[in-house]
Amino acid sequence: MHKIKINMLSNADKVRGQGVGSAYLEQVALVKNELSDYFDVVINDSKPADIIHCHTILPQYLMKMKRNKGINVAYVHFLPDTLDGSIQLPHSALTVFKKYITHFYNTADYLIVVNPIFIKDLVRFGIDEHKIKYIPNFVSKETFYKQEKEHIQQTRSQYHIDENAFVVLGVGQVQTRKGVKDFIEVAKKLPDITFVWAGGFSFGKITDGYEELKEIYENPPHNVHFIGIVPRESMNDIYNMADILFMPSYNELFPMSILEAINSQKPLLLRNL
């Protein structure tokens, strides 16, 4: 039986602490493990493939799509508008970047969105609705799962968190769009509750609100712990040591953290978007 060759193009795993990388790794593992009878998956390969599947929008991937004689698929992990509140660039540079994103998406034969609510936003940017398909994000239950109490207490001890504390967890890059300042304000109003934020400045000084958020990060309230960027293989420990996931984000597509927390059997407190 002839296998369909899929060339997965991505550099998402090169930037630590961002959900795009997690989504990419989960999807590659899913196709390799569950659909290996039908698909031959290669990563960033230079040879021709039946399907090119872009997970990030590097210019070299755009060139590959334009030269490709097979089918081009691009994952929509963010919209042009979600750059606002995520990174800060000069207005002219941001305008050009948004146009580039739209051009990249238009070049693909098919676009995959992880949340159907954003189909209309892509159409607003001039993209043909018929080429947009919805496939939700996926998180393996072998990677994220409920742990035993003894293991949870070990993790709390590692991060100097009292074993009897009620722990509210925030996950994501430290940036304006993620609602970090609201997270802090809630923590100030609940001084007897422990708040933990897992994530950091994945894009350094171009992070939106960097100077203000850096000051908060380095001098948080007494009941807030910023634990930095945690390797993905350790994130299951972090979810398990928490009592609830709190995500005050202002703009999201489909955060991997929600699925990861659900697999770890944690309740969710989310902003109504």
Q: PLM features: residue spans?
A:
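Glycosyltransferase donor-sugar binding loop
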Residues: 139, 194-212, 228
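Carbohydrate-associated surface elements
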Residues: 117, 138
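Aromatic "clamp/platform" in nucleotide-sugar-dependent glycosyltransferases that forms part
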Residues: 250
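Conserved donor-binding/catalytic core segment of Leloir-type glycosyltransferases
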Residues: 162-178, 184-190, 196-198
